[in-house]
Amino acid sequence: MTKKLTYLLLFIPLISLSQGISLNVSQDARLALIGDERGNGAFTTNVNLAAEFRGWQKGSSYFLMRPEIEYADLKGGELYRMTANFGYTFNKWVKNVDFTATVGGGMLSRHGLGGLHTQANLQTTWYFTKGIGLFLDSEFVQRVDLPKKFVGYSGKVGLKILLR
């Protein structure tokens, strides 16, 4: 109980200081549609859930912080990742379209082992109605559970909902 209360108290300043909050839900497109070369078939679950806390608008962009969790039901074992991302969103270049670049790092768990990872994301969001957008996310990630690969790539499709 005290652990949950501590986490809640840590998020209160983020919520009160942020100029906007959104909820992002995404799925790895390749794993959803065709699978991959590691034996994961189509319809493999690989879901990301993120909360995006926006800073003050400065010109054509704003700073953001995006904590994120990922769950993937992969062949050979489940993957859990927690990431803290920081970056900028450029939202004044094209009407109803945001361009976001972030970098982040965090922890992952797979095959009973834990480790650190780093990542960089490029995301494009198209708002098809007020407060709801569809996004494409290109993720470049360094994970300890990927043998013989320094950087892996993932393309995600998702929904962004502006809460405030």
What are these regions (language model features)?
Residues 1-22, 164:
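Cleavable N-terminal export/targeting peptides
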Residues 17-64, 69-71, 156-164:
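Short glycine/proline- and aromatic-enriched beta-strand/turn motifs that initiate or cap beta-hairpins
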Residues 19-27, 61-67, 82, 97-103, ...:
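Transmembrane beta-strands of outer-membrane beta-barrel proteins
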Residues 26-34, 68-72, 87-89, 104-110, ...:
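Outer-membrane beta-barrel pore domains and translocons
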Residues 33-39, 71, 120-164:
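Predominantly the C-terminal beta-signal and adjacent terminal strand-loop region
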Residues 41-47, 78-82, 114-118, 149-155:
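Residues that define the transmembrane beta-barrel architecture of outer-membrane proteins
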Residues 48-52, 85-89, 121-123, 158:
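Outer-membrane beta-barrel architecture
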Residues 53-59, 73, 90-96, 126-132, ...:
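Outer-membrane beta-barrel strand-turn architecture
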